[in-house]
A protein has these predicted regions:
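Alpha-helical transmembrane segments of multi-pass membrane transport proteins
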Residues: 1-184
Length: 184
């Protein structure tokens, strides 16, 4: 079945991206975008899981890539390791909702042919709401525990980080545009 072939290829793409440094570029972009919030590294973890899940389609690949990079950074900044693990584990399932999602592909097959493109379009809002709600809860906990806030980045840092992460973000647009447009 051609639809089932997408699953191992999404996982392979996630592993290749992790080894190629895309996860690190996405984490740096998330740092620039959300680094000024209380518990900034926890917010970076959530945003990076959402971005990486949107590229790889796999929550497991997202958890491994982002968690392996973020856990040492959070420990160095004084975050409780249990809190860091909880944030990573609770935010990686957003990769199951934000397309392309392996779970939505399997659901399409099991349900008797529900349109994968329609499922992918329906996954964006719940995935984003899940990420935003996790960020609210994380912000409250981080403020109570007194976790650090990163300094405000300069415009040059924002530009440089965005330019470096742009190919990663264009990959999401290419994959989703191809699937929704019927090219893939």
């Amino acid at each position: 079945n051609f639809a089932l072939l997408a699953i191992p290829f999404f996982i392979l793409a996630g592993n290749i991206m992790n080894q190629g440094g895309i996860a690190e570029r996405l984490i740096n972009l998330a740092k620039v975008l959300g680094g000024r919030l209380p518990g900034s590294l926890a917010h970076v973890n959530i945003m990076a899981n959402m971005l990486f899940g949107a590229i790889s389609g796999s929550a497991v690949a997202s958890a491994a890539a982002v968690g392996g990079t973020m856990a040492p950074m959070q420990k160095k900044e004084g975050y409780d390791p249990a809190f860091s693990a909880a944030v990573n584990i609770s935010s990686c399932p957003s990769g199951l909702l934000i397309p392309p999602s392996n779970t939505l592909i399997v659901f399409s097959l099991v349900s008797g042919g529900t349109s994968i493109a329609a499922l992918f379009l329906a996954g964006y809002i719940p995935g984003l709401l899940m990420g935003l709600s996790l960020m609210v809860v994380t912000g409250i906990i981080a403020k109570r525990r007194g976790y650090p806030v990163s300094p405000k980045p300069s415009c040059a840092q924002i530009w440089d980080t965005t330019v470096k992460a742009l190919p990663s973000l264009l990959l999401v647009i290419l994959i989703m545009g191809g699937i929704i447009g019927g090219i893939f």
